[in-house]
């Protein structure tokens, strides 16, 4: 799908996507702030300083196309995919559905296409939906992670709620306890908040700090002639004063990709790869550092696990027009609608359609290599105590198992957490300080999903 939308309409839509009110932090957000806070103290240790230096170097190499990191596409094509991914299809996960494969991706996108409609004499974009049930599930999950992402950006940029209003004493204590200071990236990379060429709030982005930034042009999501600079400095999107950490696009990309994985479990591993690609594409654009992407991934995965566990403060909360009391049941209801819609469009059982794939996600060896490279982006160990020690997921974050059981019902929660423990990535990263939140930075849902699928009793009988 390609749409041609007037620049005025596009700017308005970008405003809708990027601007939302930031409220005072809630009780559920304090653990999120605490979990992401280790970045603020990286300059206090030699290991942390080395990680900061590597973060800039890795980011620059990926953005410039000089990295040895495997990608799903040749670099020029990956750049174009990154430009396409700059637009958030938050209403229906349309832009991420290509991870479902050739057949199912086309079927999903045919059911959720975008159209331009006239309302009150103005052109507006209408996002198609599988069903109201699916739309509600997506909106509720996105609202949860979006609120967390918005708060964390300002908190880690200048220690405020919205750029100006101070945070609570409890939130401030999070930084005090670890000797943390906001604007870590701005200060570390020579662009402290408010200085020439810097973000006015803090945590300037790579396009503001990299010694060499690669600008490129192409067609965006709407098929319009554009380029990465247009989505960094305007007019399509202006991120000059939008703080870097954590990546909001990555948070969205993982949340919606994982929702699609849960809705279509046959494509769970590939949807995790799609999420990883979406996050890595933010580095290619010059919008984010590797640490931003890792932070966004961890935030989305953590939030989704809390939703699936029906944790108080996550469910039964009003998000706009929607309120969900039982997220797992809402997911089950939505899956029934998605399955019917996809089978109707594809013309075959969903398992057969899932296997019909000629997309960039069809090569498992390529998926393996690329996804593995994004687990840590090669950043060095910061927390030596957790580096060589597997984290006990069941003990630290037992709700994480729902990320598997919600898709693969033959698993018990204990079995799911055992798989997550066995497949977790390397430890000791900049978020892996031994906390419950930190363990989410180690989860390897790609390998975990593969093991879960292999454990299907129906497969074992064949």
Predicted regions and their residues:
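N-terminal signal peptide c-region/cleavage motif recognized by signal peptidases
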Residues: 19-21
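Hydrophobic alpha-helical bundle signature of multipass membrane enzymes
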Residues: 25-284, 313, 322-326, 333, ...
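Extended amphipathic alpha-helical segments with heptad-repeat/coiled-coil character used for oligomerization
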Residues: 244, 287-350
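Bacterial N-terminal signal peptides that target proteins for export
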Residues: 1-11
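Extended ligand-binding clefts on enzyme/binding-domain cores
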Residues: 343-362, 366-371
């Amino acid at each position: 799908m390609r749409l041609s939308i007037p620049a005025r309409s596009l700017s308005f839509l970008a405003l809708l996507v990027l601007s939302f009110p930031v409220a005072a932090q809630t009780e559920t957000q304090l653990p999120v702030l605490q979990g992401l806070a280790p970045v603020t103290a990286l300059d206090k240790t030699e290991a942390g300083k080395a990680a900061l230096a590597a973060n800039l170097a890795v980011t620059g190499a990926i953005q410039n196309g000089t990295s040895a990191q495997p990608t799903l596409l040749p670099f020029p094509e990956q750049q174009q995919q990154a430009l396409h991914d700059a637009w958030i299809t938050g209403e229906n996960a349309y832009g991420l559905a290509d991870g479902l494969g050739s057949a199912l991706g086309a079927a999903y996108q045919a059911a959720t296409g975008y159209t331009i409609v006239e309302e009150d004499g103005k052109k507006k974009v209408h996002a198609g939906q599988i069903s109201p049930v699916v739309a509600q599930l997506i909106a509720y999950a996105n609202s949860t992670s979006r609120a967390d992402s918005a708060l964390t950006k300002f908190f880690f940029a200048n220690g405020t709620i919205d750029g100006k209003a101070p945070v609570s004493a409890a939130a401030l204590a999070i930084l005090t306890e670890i000797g943390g200071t906001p604007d870590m990236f701005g200060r570390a990379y020579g662009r402290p908040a408010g200085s020439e060429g810097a973000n006015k709030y803090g945590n300037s982005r790579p396009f503001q700090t990299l010694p060499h930034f690669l600008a490129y042009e192409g067609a965006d999501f709407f098929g319009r002639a554009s380029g990465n600079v247009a989505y960094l400095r305007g007019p399509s999107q202006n991120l000059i004063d939008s703080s870097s950490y954590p990546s909001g696009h990555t948070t969205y990309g993982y949340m919606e990709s994982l929702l699609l994985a849960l809705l279509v479990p046959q494509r769970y591993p590939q949807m995790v790869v799609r999420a990883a690609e979406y996050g890595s594409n933010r580095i290619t654009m010059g919008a984010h550092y590797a640490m931003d992407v890792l932070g966004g991934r961890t935030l989305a995965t953590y939030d989704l696990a809390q939703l699936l566990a029906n944790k108080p403060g996550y469910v039964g909360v009003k998000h706009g027009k929607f309120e969900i009391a039982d997220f797992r049941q809402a997911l089950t209801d939505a899956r029934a609608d998605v399955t019917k819609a996809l089978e109707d469009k594809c013309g075959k059982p969903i398992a057969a359609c899932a296997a019909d794939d000629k997309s960039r996600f069809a090569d498992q060896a390529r998926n393996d290599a690329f996804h593995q490279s994004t687990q840590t982006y090669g950043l060095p160990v910061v927390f030596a105590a957790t580096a060589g020690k597997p984290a006990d997921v069941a003990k630290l974050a037992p709700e994480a198992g729902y990320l598997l059981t919600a898709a693969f019902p033959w698993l018990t929660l204990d079995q799911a957490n055992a798989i997550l423990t066995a497949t977790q990535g390397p430890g000791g990263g900049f978020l892996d300080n031994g906390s419950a939140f930190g363990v989410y930075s180690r989860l390897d849902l790609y390998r975990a999903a593969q093991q879960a699928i292999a454990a299907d009793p129906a497969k074992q009988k064949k």
